[in-house]
Amino acid sequence: HADFGGEVERILNMVDGAVLLVDAAEGPMPQTKFVLQKALKIGLRPIVCINKIDRPDERHNEVVNEVFDLFANLDASEEQLDFPIIYGSAKQGWMADSPTGPQDGMAPLFDLVVKHFNPPVVEDGPFRMLVTTIESNPFLGRVLTGRVRSGAIKANQSVKALARDGKTVEQGRISKVLAFRGLERVPVDEAEAGDIIAISGLTTATVADTICDSSVSEPIAAQPIDPPTLTMTFRINDGPLAGKE
């Protein structure tokens, strides 16, 4: 969403691909353009999913043309313009290569994801992870989520946090490593490069900091964040009529 541009950019930089969900009747929405522009800019090759194909007012042919025009207007590359299309109804629980079905589960979408997206690109070296989001948990404390760029991480491992300028923010030990399994987070013994994980144990590190092995001195370059949609400045009224209006 345009109101959360920074968060959108950080999330997109964790993924290897994207599924662009478009309503079969309404077509691309304003927020579709915003998020798609970000995805194309960093080189992602989206899968286009035409959803709600069961609506009586669906117009999938026109919507596909609108999506193609949107890609072209956003300066998509030839490879990005050659996007695969899948149709279906999330409400009814099916996806298929054809708008007419077969209406037999979500497997075609999952198969397309495996086929179309490249595996995670990993780097050699000790553990490094760029913090993408933070949250507070009543049991775990500060929870940092990000993608492991290189190396591996285990619970009770010593790490440090580097700010974007390379200064050490804090040093500590990881108390818990959580991996994502569907919509749930489950504790794991170890996470490796390419995994998206959540960790706890640090108290000061924040978004755009690099969590890394103690031997690392260079932080991961953080994605520039869009300026606010609206900015406001407040100052004390020190005019001659202050307090007299």
PLM segments and residue spans:
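Structural and coupling elements of P-loop NTPases
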Residues: H1-E245
